[in-house]
């Protein structure tokens, strides 16, 4: 596998450091005439799927998403990795904190675009769950960045880019989220209570 890019970090403070929770996008090293990409299979293991670029059933016009026999796939798989800094400029990998990988059928293509909300109860991570089933918002809670509680999908498809407010307003929790269906209503930022 090769890392194709680092994207959309969630930023927070922990243990007197500045941390980034990076989205890491990976794919297999590509071979001539073949397009290959990773997915999580039903057993939760990474499986590499490959198609011939010459196949009449392949539409690879978008470098991020391909379609084969009418079924869509992402060309990379994303997961989340922590890096830290004492000065906010120079960051280093923290091996004692494991990456956060996709899990289950709603995260077959991985997890993306994480936001980190710091609360008195720890850290709440909202992120995009990506699969052939749907694109929606997932939620994870942690206090120590080693143990996680997964709450599953909290905003239904097609939805992404969720940010929880870190403090209650009028005794209630709020979040911004983005239903993203240009065909039905457009791309707007919504406020959820």
Kindly give the residue locations of the regions a language model identified.
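Beta-rich carbohydrate-recognition and catalytic domains
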Residues: 1-109, 117-163, 167-193
């Amino acid at each position: 596998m090769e890392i194709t890019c680092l994207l959309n970090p969630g930023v927070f403070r922990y243990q007197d450091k500045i941390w980034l929770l990076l989205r890491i996008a990976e794919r297999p090293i590509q071979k001539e005439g073949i397009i290959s990409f990773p997915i999580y299979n039903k057993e939760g293991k990474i499986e590499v799927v490959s198609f011939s670029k010459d196949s009449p059933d392949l539409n690879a016009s978008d470098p991020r998403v391909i379609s084969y026999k009418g079924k869509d796939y992402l060309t990379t798989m994303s997961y989340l990795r922590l890096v830290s800094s004492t000065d906010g400029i120079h960051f280093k990998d923290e091996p004692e904190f494991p990456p956060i990988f996709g899990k289950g059928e709603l995260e077959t293509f991985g997890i993306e675009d994480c936001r980190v909300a710091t609360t008195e109860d720890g850290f709440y991570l909202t992120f995009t769950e990506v699969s052939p089933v749907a694109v929606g918002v997932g939620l994870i809670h942690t206090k120590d960045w080693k143990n996680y509680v997964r709450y599953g999908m909290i905003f239904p498809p097609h939805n992404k880019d969720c940010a929880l407010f870190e403090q209650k307003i009028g005794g209630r929790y709020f979040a911004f989220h983005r239903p993203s269906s240009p065909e039905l209503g457009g791309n707007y930022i919504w406020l959820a209570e």
